[in-house]
């Protein structure tokens, strides 16, 4: 009887251990993020993202063989020496505080952007001076953070400068580097090495720990997106612990990236991307390529239309199946791994994911219905380059009925002479109205043209850089862009019209926000995507994370994210209109001008 009972008990050990490990790693993940970003150890200021990854791996590797609380204490001994663990919430502050001996870490934005001479995101150690900003931590106070059941981390985000040890900090990174280097087999081939890293649960736990913390502490739209990110952490840790990534096969690498995309899909940020980079320290850098069927597509609510192809497929045919699976089912499945703020844009992104693969030399079977109603199939080998266009290229400048049409998103609009060419056309043709097409990504050279559309100063205050010095975005402040766009002569007085749809995002939306805010013209079409502001990047050994780094809103503070710029005149484009060669948006605009 006892033997039977013992057998039954042992049969539950793997499940219990799995749940216990998830809780342990969840507690570790929270502690790691708080110490990394909000304990002001100035000796770590020159550490880069990969250094921090190695340190995270070093401590995560200890969990399982050691009590989680002991691992967190060991981590705190270097990164936050005056922090302590308690089994219930504590309230504590230092006495007789001399402010000038304390410091805190201030994050102005997060991540990094690679633009010469432009550094909008940075972190710095601030020496306390007795003054208190809205975002700064209280000097000498231990803030209490719940890590798990009866497990609390008490940490000073404003701490004494001399409590941190350079020797201990340097030794920690040295030990972390040694452990990382031991992961590689000098005799192994590249792909085997990469697969073995993804097979390593400690690697996966470290990776998802950092990815969770980035959103938790820095994503500027966490509130607007309604993210219950706290509850996502155990889900992510559970995924990291799953044996689905323990397979010693090439597909494990691809499956892992897809899992990351799915984990981030609740985030509604059209800039968000899990790129294909593989840059493991100690291994050659590679990029996980994506291959596409040679189809240029247009996306509508009820169908996908083939605009052009590298195959003998009639233009205007409707795509119905990919390798035997209904296109709508494929789009639905792909949408689960896409971060978008606009449903139409989400469908468009999923449409191109539907005709892509990470497998070199893959062959897809395309099923389609011709304009005559005949169902046909074609087989095609996928190519490295994504199909470029949804539309036939147009001239940058067109004229009809004394209306100047400026196609801002055409490739030739990005030539350096765009501004001069526009001003020359304007003077020579003296149009009665101007139509600017921003259905896509417009040329940056349009920036100067904006200043000719107004006779008043225009504020750049749509954009705010988050300022954080405490975890969980507590007491977040903002650095508002105080720049001003000055009017330029000659002032353009003829009516201006702007065409928009879901393809207008980022810089295109900034243009439309100026138009709307300062009444520079009339917007026709459908709403823009709802994502603008400079991007930022976080570096990982594999699959860098890219997302929006700034917070954008209208000048009165009202929300833009996820809503976009609403047109003054709404005009929807149907598949039938498109197939008949009609641009009903521009047709309606011209009709109203006349």
Q: How would you name each of these model-derived features?
A:
Residues 27-28, 32-49, 60-63, 201, ...:
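Cleft-lining beta-strand/loop regions that shape enzyme active-site pockets
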Residues 29, 33, 102-152, 156-173, ...:
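PDZ/PDZ-like domain segments forming the peptide/carboxylate-binding groove
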Residues 31, 35-39, 61, 211, ...:
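Conserved PDZ fold ligand-binding element
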Residues 41-74, 220-271:
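Amphipathic alpha-helical substructures
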Residues 568-594:
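Low-complexity, Gly/Ser/Thr/Pro-rich intrinsically disordered linker/tail segments
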């Amino acid at each position: 009887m006892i033997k039977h009972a013992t057998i039954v008990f042992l049969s539950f050990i793997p499940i219990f251990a799995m749940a216990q490990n998830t809780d342990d790693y969840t507690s570790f993940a929270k502690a790691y993020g708080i110490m990394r970003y909000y304990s002001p150890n100035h000796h770590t200021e020159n550490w880069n993202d990969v250094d921090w990854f190695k340190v995270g791996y070093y401590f995560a590797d200890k969990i399982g063989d050691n009590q989680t609380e002991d691992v967190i204490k060991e981590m705190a001994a270097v990164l936050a020496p005056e922090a302590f663990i308690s089994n219930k919430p504590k309230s504590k502050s230092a006495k007789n505080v001399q402010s000038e001996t304390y410091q805190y870490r201030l994050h102005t934005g997060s991540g990094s952007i690679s633009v010469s001479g432009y550094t909008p995101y940075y972190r710095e150690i601030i020496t306390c001076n007795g003054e208190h900003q809205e975002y700064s931590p209280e000097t000498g106070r231990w803030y209490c953070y719940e890590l798990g059941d009866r497990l609390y981390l008490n940490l000073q985000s404003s701490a004494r400068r001399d409590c941190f040890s350079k020797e201990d900090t340097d030794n920690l990174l040295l030990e972390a580097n040694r452990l990382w280097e031991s992961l590689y087999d000098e005799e192994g081939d590249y792909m085997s090495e990469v697969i073995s890293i993804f097979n390593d649960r400690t690697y996966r736990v470290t990776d998802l720990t950092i990815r969770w913390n980035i959103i938790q502490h820095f994503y500027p739209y966490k509130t607007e997106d309604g993210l219950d990110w706290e509850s996502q952490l155990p889900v992510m840790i559970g995924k990291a612990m799953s044996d689905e990534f323990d397979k010693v096969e090439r597909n494990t690498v691809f499956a892992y990236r897809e899992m990351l995309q799915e984990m981030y899909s609740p985030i509604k940020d059209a800039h968000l991307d899990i790129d294909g980079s593989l840059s493991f320290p100690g291994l050659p850098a590679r990029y996980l390529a994506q291959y596409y069927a040679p189809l240029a597509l247009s996306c509508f609510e009820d169908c996908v239309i083939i605009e052009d192809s590298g195959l003998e497929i009639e233009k205007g045919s409707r795509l119905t199946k990919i390798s035997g699976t209904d296109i709508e089912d494929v789009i639905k499945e792909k949408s689960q791994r896409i971060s978008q703020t606009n449903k139409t844009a989400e469908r468009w992104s999923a449409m191109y994911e539907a005709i892509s693969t990470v497998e070199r030399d893959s062959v897809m079977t395309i099923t389609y219905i011709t304009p005559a109603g005949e169902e046909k199939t074609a087989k095609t080998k996928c190519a490295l380059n994504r199909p470029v266009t949804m539309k036939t290229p147009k001239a940058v400048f067109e004229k009809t009925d004394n209306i100047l049409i400026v196609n801002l998103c055409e490739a030739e609009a990005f030539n350096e002479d765009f501004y001069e060419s526009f001003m020359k056309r304007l003077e020579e043709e003296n149009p009665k109205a101007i139509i600017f097409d921003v259905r896509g990504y417009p040329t940056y050279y349009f920036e100067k043209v904006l200043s000719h559309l107004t006779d008043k100063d225009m504020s750049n205050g749509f954009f705010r850089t988050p300022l954080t010095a405490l975890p969980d975005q507590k007491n977040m402040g903002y650095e508002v862009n105080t720049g001003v766009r000055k009017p330029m002569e000659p002032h353009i007085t003829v009516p201006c019209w702007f065409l928009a749809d879901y393809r207008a995002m980022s810089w295109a939306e900034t243009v439309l926000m100026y138009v709307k805010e300062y009444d520079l013209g009339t917007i026709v079409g459908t709403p823009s995507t709802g994502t603008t502001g400079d991007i930022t990047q976080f570096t990982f050994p594999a699959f860098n994370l890219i997302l929006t780094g700034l917070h954008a809103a209208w000048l009165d503070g009202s929300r833009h994210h996820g809503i976009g710029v609403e047109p003054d005149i709404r005009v929807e484009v149907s598949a039938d209109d498109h197939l008949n060669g009609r641009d009903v948006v521009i047709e309606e605009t011209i009709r109203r001008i006349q």
